Amino acid sequence: MRLVLACVGRLKAGAERDLVTRYVDRIRPAGRPLGLGPCDMIEIPESAARRAEDRMAEEGAALLAALPAGAGLIALDPRGRQLSSEDFATRMAAQRDGGLPALAFIIGGADGLADAVRDKAALMVAYGTATFPHQLVRVMLAEQIYRAVTILAGHPYHRA
């Protein structure tokens, strides 16, 4: 199952981009025997619309249009569920075992996700009640995807 990290906005060169790339690159060899990967990154430009609702709608439509056909969706959203790394891995495996060709992890723009994206998500995940910069959320999500792959593989990376 192909994995896709789809985000609004571009990560500039720097430490955050390097970390995301490091985890995405690690997913391919670790996930191949499990039928997971490769992991591709899709970056959608931020909308220039004046109203937040219009920005979210434009960004949401662009995100959904960029995803592979038949992809399952896991969206990061403050209204989502807080999952342990093990639960996250189990949810990923369930999507894979359901025969999906791809699983997309969605990070919205500064205004959040459009209802159209939330409605299509099989799962919404929150990283707590605090607000984090989008750059760090991408790093955290890429690491959690890699961690989930290693949990499913029985690799010692995850020791909890």
Swiss-Prot record:
<keyword id="KW-0963">Cytoplasm</keyword>
<dbReference type="InterPro" id="IPR029026">
    <property type="entry name" value="tRNA_m1G_MTases_N"/>
</dbReference>
<dbReference type="InterPro" id="IPR029028">
    <property type="entry name" value="Alpha/beta_knot_MTases"/>
</dbReference>
<keyword id="KW-0949">S-adenosyl-L-methionine</keyword>
<comment type="subunit">
    <text>Homodimer.</text>
</comment>
<dbReference type="Pfam" id="PF02590">
    <property type="entry name" value="SPOUT_MTase"/>
</dbReference>
<comment type="function">
    <text>Specifically methylates the pseudouridine at position 1915 (m3Psi1915) in 23S rRNA.</text>
</comment>
<dbReference type="InterPro" id="IPR003742">
    <property type="entry name" value="RlmH-like"/>
</dbReference>
<feature type="binding site">
    <location>
        <position position="76"/>
    </location>
    <ligand>
        <name>S-adenosyl-L-methionine</name>
    </ligand>
</feature>
<keyword id="KW-0489">Methyltransferase</keyword>
<comment type="similarity">
    <text>Belongs to the RNA methyltransferase RlmH family.</text>
</comment>
<protein>
    <recommendedName>
        <fullName>Ribosomal RNA large subunit methyltransferase H</fullName>
        <ecNumber>2.1.1.177</ecNumber>
    </recommendedName>
</protein>
<dbReference type="GO" id="GO:0005737">
    <property type="term" value="C:cytoplasm"/>
</dbReference>
<feature type="binding site">
    <location>
        <position position="108"/>
    </location>
    <ligand>
        <name>S-adenosyl-L-methionine</name>
    </ligand>
</feature>
<keyword id="KW-0698">rRNA processing</keyword>
<dbReference type="GO" id="GO:0070038">
    <property type="term" value="F:rRNA (pseudouridine-N3-)-methyltransferase activity"/>
</dbReference>
<keyword id="KW-0808">Transferase</keyword>
